[in-house]
Structure formats: structure tokens, C-alpha cells
């Protein structure tokens, strides 16, 4: 029986490249002259910590990150911006989490969406992915279109298509 997996993955190298490009742009921008701005990527915890001078600079860096992530073909919906907190050195700090893997709630929403479509396919949750199996390849392609059109606010990839 044909099947495929719905996953949410991030290319770690592209994330690293995007963060480095943002740092290069910050070095060349006039409005960041004389302002200490730090961006640290922690690959183990999948977080980016951002420390800069004021609220306007945080917004500018956020816009730069979204632009560079889009340029590097990493979906900006995989960025989860935390709240802005003041630091002891009169600067502002923001934690950005990289969403990777499908959590249980989102997986349940996907399965519910697929079952509500009345297509003759089965969806099963496997750790941080959803496996969809069906008799017809056309039904599987309909499921891909259905999930792509849904507003689940998360980037999905469709892998392991088996016939």
C-alpha cells in the first residue's frame, strides 16, 4: 500500500547560514553602529538568543531574520519568538525557539483533519511524524494538498513516499 510521512524538519546548516548572514548585515548597517548586538545559535537546544539595545533594534533584527531565513529556504513559521526581557546591562534579550518535529496536539489535529475529509486513507501518529497510508496514490496527493492548505501555523514536509 502506498504511504508517506508528514514531518517538520529544519536544515541546521541553513539555519546557521541565515544567522551568520544576519550578523554580517548587522555589522554593515548604519543604525546598528555603536550598539552591542549579539546573536547566539545553540544547536543542542535549538534556540537563538538575541541581545541588543532597544525595542526598535529587536524588531529590525527580527525582520532581518525572517528575510534571511526565507532567502535560505527555511520557513519562518519554524521560528517561535519569545517575549522580550530586559537584561542587567540595560539591554533587551529575546529567546527564539526553532520548532522541529510535530508535537502531539498538532499531530492529533492533522489526523482529525484527514479523517474529516472522508478520504480512504489511514493516518497514524509515530513519535514526531504522521504516517498516512492508502490504496490510491491520488488519495495521498489529496491529503498532501489538504494539509498544505490547512492553517496549522507550522511548516510541513512530505517524505518517504512509497508506492
From Swiss-Prot:
Molecular-function GO term, any one: nucleotide binding
GO cellular component: cytosol
Name of a matching Pfam family: DUF520
Protein origin, superkingdom: Bacteria
Database matches in InterPro entries: DUF520 (IPR007551), UPF0234-like_C (IPR035571), UPF0234_N (IPR035570), YajQ-like_sf (IPR036183)
PANTHER family given in the database record: UPF0234 PROTEIN YAJQ
Function: Nucleotide-binding protein.
Family the UniProt entry places it in: Belongs to the YajQ family.
Protein name: Nucleotide-binding protein Desal_2385
Organism field: Maridesulfovibrio salexigens (strain ATCC 14822 / DSM 2638 / NCIMB 8403 / VKM B-1763) (Desulfovibrio salexigens)
Organism lineage: Bacteria, Pseudomonadati, Thermodesulfobacteriota, Desulfovibrionia, Desulfovibrionales
Amino acid at each position: 500500500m502506498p504511504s508517506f510521512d508528514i514531518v517538520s524538519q529544519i536544515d541546521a546548516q541553513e539555519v546557521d547560514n541565515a544567522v551568520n548572514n544576519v550578523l554580517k548585515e548587522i555589522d554593515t548597517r548604519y543604525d546598528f553602529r555603536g550598539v552591542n548586538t549579539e546573536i547566539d545559535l545553540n544547536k543542542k537546544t535549538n534556540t537563538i538568543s538575541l541581545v541588543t539595545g532597544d525595542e526598535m533594534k529587536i524588531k529590525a533584527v527580527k525582520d532581518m531574520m525572517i528575510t534571511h531565513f526565507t532567502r535560505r529556504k527555511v520557513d519562518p513559521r519554524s521560528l517561535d519568538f519569545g517575549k522580550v526581557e530586559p537584561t542587567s546591562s540595560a539591554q533587551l534579550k529575546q529567546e527564539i525557539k526553532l520548532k522541529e518535529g510535530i508535537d502531539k496536539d498538532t499531530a492529533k489535529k492533522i489526523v482529525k483533519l484527514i479523517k474529516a475529509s472522508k478520504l480512504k486513507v489511514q493516518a497514524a501518529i509515530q513519535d514526531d511524524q504522521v504516517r498516512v497510508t492508502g490504496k490510491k496514490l491520488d488519495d495521498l496527493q489529496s491529503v498532501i494538498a489538504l494539509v498544505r492548505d490547512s492553517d496549522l501555523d507550522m511548516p510541513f514536509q512530505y517524505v518517504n513516499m512509497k508506492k
